[in-house]
Swiss-Prot record:
Its EC number is 2.6.1.16. SUPFAM superfamilies: N-terminal nucleophile aminohydrolases (Ntn hydrolases). This is Putative glutamine--fructose-6-phosphate aminotransferase [isomerizing]. InterPro entries: GATase_2_dom, GFAT_N, Ntn_hydrolases_N. The keyword Transferase applies. It comes from Saccharomyces cerevisiae (strain ATCC 204508 / S288c) (Baker's yeast). The lineage of its organism: Eukaryota, Fungi, Dikarya, Ascomycota, Saccharomycotina. Gene3D superfamilies: Glutamine Phosphoribosylpyrophosphate, subunit 1, domain 1. It comes from the Eukaryota. It holds the Pfam family GATase_6.
């Protein structure tokens, strides 16, 4: 049982302190009495860097953990994407290493928060460990950011420069089970990917003016042909080792309008 939350400011300056406060407030809104750990990921001092802060206990313990780092909370960000997570331990016991967010590597190239159950995580973990990836947790989630990195690195080696959403499609095709997830990456600063299968996920957009109307483009796999079909690159059938692209159809449609009365 988990709750995930993300916050993005785009071309609207926010300080690091404001961003952290928003992420914490989002977690507090999701917090349930049985939740026993939480964490956030935010941009570091450099553009292409991500920092992770997490702790067992209530969200108040996470706030205390963050304060230990004496961060410059006045540092401004014109654009920024942060993600957060709170959980009750299921896969993996109650220890800090099992808290989300989980990363792909010590440099935090890919960072993921996840709600759901990846039923084939044991097979994915065995495959990735055989490729040299080191797992720090007992969770099913940790295979996701490492899968991101493996497919990203393999694609670069093969000469394919994938964007974030195409890369995500490759990752999702390997996952079995249910998920609502958010992913950020140092390779794609100021971007966040949100995906769901089975688990709930809600996207909200705040308007700039009264009665502002916004839309979000949402990609669906294997939908009816009355939606716009896009040809995007993905790997051939088989396991994660295959990264040579072939074409498949996805469908793009706009969300219902977000109408704001600010």
């Amino acid at each position: 049982m988990c709750g995930i939350f993300g916050y993005c400011n785009f071309l609207i300056e926010k300080t690091r302190g404001e961003i952290i406060d928003t992420l914490i407030e989002g977690l507090q809104a999701l917090e349930y009495k049985e939740y026993d750990s939480s964490g956030i990921s935010i941009q570091g001092d450099e553009l292409e860097s991500l920092n992770i802060y997490k702790q067992t206990g209530k969200i108040s313990s996470l706030k205390e953990e963050i304060d230990l780092y004496n961060l410059n909370k006045n540092l401004p960000f014109i654009s920024h994407c942060g993600i957060a997570h709170t959980r009750r331990a299921t896969h993996g016991g109650l220890r800090r290493a099992n808290c989300h967010p989980h990363n792909s590597d010590p440099s935090n190239e890919f960072v993921v928060v996840h709600n759901g159950v990846i039923t084939n995580f044991a097979n994915l973990k065995a495959l990735l460990m055989a490729k040299g990836y080191v797992f720090k947790s007992d969770t099913d989630t940790e295979c996701i950011p490492k899968l991101y990195k493996h497919i990203y690195d393999t694609s670069i080696e093969l000469g394919y420069n994938l964007d974030f959403h195409v890369l995500t499609n490759l990752v999702l095709k390997e996952l079995e089970g249910s998920y609502g997830l958010l992913c950020t990456s140092s390779h794609f600063p100021d971007e966040v990917v949100a995906a769901r299968k089975g688990s709930p996920l809600v996207i909200g957009v705040k308007g700039k003016t009264d009665m502002d109307v916004n839309f979000v483009e949402v990609e669906y796999l294997d939908q009816e042909e009355d939606y716009l079909k896009l040809n995007t690159q993905t790997k051939s059938s088989g396991n994660v080792l295959a990264a040579a692209p072939v074409k498949y159809n996805t469908c793009l449609r706009k969300s219902p309008p977000f109408v704001h009365n600010t």
